[in-house]
């Protein structure tokens, strides 16, 4: 089934209102296996809507119209669709009763003739009750095309879709199932190149790559009649992807850290620390507390994070972390030595299981002979301490700081998986 969404309202075209209904409807159609091929916004203009209906009816099996069902003069959707189909508007009894009750309970409201239009549907339509508003919706099939009329306010449209439209449409369709794989340490272009043959030959399931700041996700999607069938297909594709060799000689599984649209490296680390009843701390320079504040964003973080240090100036590093100023001056603020010592001392001073040190050059200028984007990350555990150098070039100052934290979380994650042994 080919579906099309038509959002009606001049305010959408002028940018006064964001077209969130189209996104919502597309997501819901995908859930029941209906393919949305087109999305269009049209103003409150009868001739342009008639022209669009003529086009849509020739290319789509399901046309979802939202907006223009209200009482004002520019609410023309219902009348225009009725005119296009050569049908009349009739009053829907339940909607009329709701309108009667609404005005009876509000005697100070004026019931003008245009209010009555909200209780009308196109003749032959199956009504879609409006739980939170007055404008009734409707479903009508004419010449093999199904027309759905919905009000514009999301607070009215969403309950109507969830409670009435989806059950009406879902009976004859397979559902769409998706799984999101998350990767860190590999760029989108490299990942897509490695999987190019698989992506080129895809049919069902499909692979869709998305680039995020510092990481990449792959959305695997399939249509199936049951969740079990979908899981079997997605499991097979996932294993094929993760077992694909990378350019570095390992497998793509080496870069895969988790699942889900809203998951993150920090969430993975926090969950792993909670599962192991371990604590973490950090001493930060270039990231200025971003690593620690990210941990503190999670509920219950006080059980795994006792406190930490933000040490920008070299003298503060020496004083707060109880380090020799002469050693810091000898090796430099931006150095493997300093990152390692920051991790060691933060762990020691807070009696934490893991200590992290972050120092580097966020820009815009180079520092101590290091280019912008040079970052040193220290990791300290009961089994020792080590520093790692990372280069994050061609990024803004804020992106460098954010990606540096991602690298730190990834190193902590791998260290936890390795039983606190350093990598």
From Swiss-Prot:
Disulfide bonds: none annotated. InterPro entries: CinA, CinA-like_C, CinA_C, CinA_KH, Competence-induced_CinA, MoaB/Mog-like_dom_sf, MoaB/Mog_dom. Gene3D superfamilies: 3.30.70.2860, CinA-like, MoaB/Mog-like domain. SUPFAM superfamilies: CinA-like, Molybdenum cofactor biosynthesis proteins. Belongs to the CinA family. PANTHER family: NICOTINAMIDE-NUCLEOTIDE AMIDOHYDROLASE PNCC, NMN AMIDOHYDROLASE-LIKE PROTEIN YFAY. This is Putative competence-damage inducible protein. It comes from Streptococcus uberis (strain ATCC BAA-854 / 0140J). The lineage of its organism: Bacteria, Bacillati, Bacillota, Bacilli, Lactobacillales. The gene is cinA.
